[in-house]
Amino acid sequence: MQDRFVRRINELPKALADELLPMLGEQFCGHLDAQQVKQLCAVSAMDSHELGLALLPIAAALAKPPVSNFYVGAIAVGSGGDFYMGANLELQGEALFHSVHAEQSAISHAWLSGETQISDIIVNASPCGHCRQFMNELVQGQAIRIHLPGQDTAPLSHYLPYAFGPADLNVTAPLLSKQQTELVLESDDPLLIEALDHAGLSYAPYSQCHAAVVLETEDGASFCGRYAENAAFNPSMLPMQMALSALVRHNRSFSDIKRAVLLESSQGKISLVGATMDALHAVAVVELEHLVVDPV
């Protein structure tokens, strides 16, 4: 079991902790498939949402909050019943806008794993306005059920009434919809090809700045982030922050980063290079490789 879970697992009921323990090996990064969820429900005599609430201490253990020291854990439930954990991330000494909220982390975890719809968000603290707006960008966002400890379950529409969302800006394919933008790059560099693939899957209906970041660590592993825009603009999630969140979920250190690539479309109304460099240079002594490519 990873060290970060040692104290947290003691907060769980014993039967649940005993069943979960073998799942928390070195490769665990916060994902439980639907079969594992059913297995844990059976052992703990909980339904899936009760289980999610019980597992929030494990999700919170994924957090890295050096500024607030406030650990937030969240679980996004995919349409097939998979659990995707996420947690808040803050960059030491840097402006707070670089932060990743737990709900964003969990949702990006699900998106990077191929989910196209989220039915529920389970979180240990009431979603802030930023996160409510971020969730409202998702497929059927207003219907997502929010679960909080000690409170009745309610849809996002309860937490964000009279919402402004993608439809108000004539966007008909919201975040998590299956969509792809074809971008052109001639290269045999696997990291650049990976960045190209993820940029094509990014969500940028407002600026057309389809973009992705890929981080490579010393052992050759790669961690990706896609740009995820928001109708309210400010709650958009930058690809570097998404990639850093993925790296931390996988229990890696920023010092492990040896390469960092930002690939973005030449047709974007904006560029993410400045913000991406700021975040990267806050955590690693690595130069950003910046590629601008044309759409088909």
From Swiss-Prot:
It comes from the Bacteria. Keywords: Hydrolase, Metal-binding, Zinc. Binds 1 zinc ion. Substrate binds at N88, L89, E90. GO terms for biological process: cytidine deamination. SUPFAM superfamilies: Cytidine deaminase-like. CDD domains: cytidine_deaminase (cd01283). Its cofactor is Zn(2+). InterPro entries: APOBEC/CMP_deaminase_Zn-bd, CMP_dCMP_dom, Cyd/dCyd_deaminase_Zn-bd, Cyt/Deoxycyt_deaminase, Cytidine_deaminase-like, Cytidine_deaminase_bacteria. GO terms for molecular function: cytidine deaminase activity; identical protein binding; zinc ion binding. It catalyses: cytidine + H2O + H(+) = uridine + NH4(+); 2'-deoxycytidine + H2O + H(+) = 2'-deoxyuridine + NH4(+). Coiled coil: none annotated. The active site is at E103. Residues 47-167, 186-296 form the CMP/dCMP-type deaminase domain. The keyword Zinc applies. GO terms for cellular component: cytosol. Zn(2+) binds at H101, C128, C131. PANTHER family: CYTIDINE DEAMINASE. Belongs to the cytidine and deoxycytidylate deaminase family. This enzyme scavenges exogenous and endogenous cytidine and 2'-deoxycytidine for UMP synthesis. This is Cytidine deaminase. It comes from Shewanella amazonensis (strain ATCC BAA-1098 / SB2B).
